[in-house]
Amino acid sequence: GGRKAKSIGINPSYRYAMGIVITANHLGMVLVNLKYEIVKSERIRLKFVSDMSYCSQVADFAAKFLDHMNDAEQKEKLLGVGISIPGIINQEQKLVIKSHALKLENYSLSFLEQAFSVPVYFSNDANAAMMAEDMNTYQNAIYLSLNQTLGGAFCIGGKLFSGENQKAGEFGHMILVPQGRKCYCGKSGCADAYCAAGALVGESKDSVEQFMQLLQNNDEKAEKKWEEYLDYLAILIS
C-alpha cells in the first residue's frame, strides 16, 4: 500500500550563472545551468584598456550574449556573474592588486561591477579554473595555469586555498634556473620565463596558435623549442 514513488530532480534550467574571462586581448563568456552544463559560450577579440570605455564594451557584449532573456528574466533567472582576471585579486575590496598581463596595479573593479544588475564575483583566473573543477572529487589538488603568465591554485580539503595575501598559487616566480633568463618581475630564472605560454614564441611575433601550427607541421625549430619547454615544465612539476 501507500503512495506510489515519485522521481524528484532539479530542473537545471530554473536558474543560470554567467562566467566572464578577461585577458589582455580577448573576452570570453559562458552561461551554465544548475547542473554546471554549458548552455552557451562565446569568445571575442577585445583588447583590455583600463578606462570606462572597456567596462561599457563588456556590458554591451554581455547584454548581447544574454539577448535570449529579457530584463525581467535576467533578474529572476540569472544568479550572478563570475569574472576571472589574470593577476592578484582582492575580492572583498573589488581590487586588482597587481596584474602583469593587464598592466594594472591597485585597480578598482567597482565600475565593472556596476555594469551588471546581478551580484558580481571576481577571481584570479587560476583560482576560477580550480573552482570549475569538481573539488568534491579532488579534495586535495594543485591547478597549474599556463597562459600569458604562469600561475596556479590550491585545493585543500575540497576548498580553495588562496593564502593571507591571495598569492598561494603564484608559482611563476619560484626560481627554476638559477641566474637564468630575466623575468618581468626583475629577478632571473623564474619559472614564468620558461613555462608561461609566451616562452614558446620567445621574441618572435608569432602567436602561440601559430607556434602550435608549426609544431603540427613538424617544423624542426618548433619541435626543439617544444621539447625544451616540456623539460622545464617537468622540472617545475616535479
Residues covered by each model-derived region:
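Gly/Thr-rich phosphate-binding beta-strand-loop-beta motif of the actin/hexokinase/Hsp70
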Residues: 4-40, 143-156
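Hydrophobic alpha-helical segments, especially N-terminal targeting/anchoring helices
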Residues: 32, 89-90, 154, 176
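Hydrophobic "anchor" residues
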Residues: 38, 95-96, 160-161
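Glycine/GP-enriched mid-protein hinge/lid loop-to-helix segment characteristic of carbohydrate kinases
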Residues: 41-43, 50-51, 110, 117-217
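Glycine-rich phosphate-binding loop and adjoining helix at the ATP-binding site
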Residues: 42-140
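Adenine-nucleotide phosphate-binding core of ATP-dependent small-molecule kinases
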Residues: 53-71, 191-194, 199-238
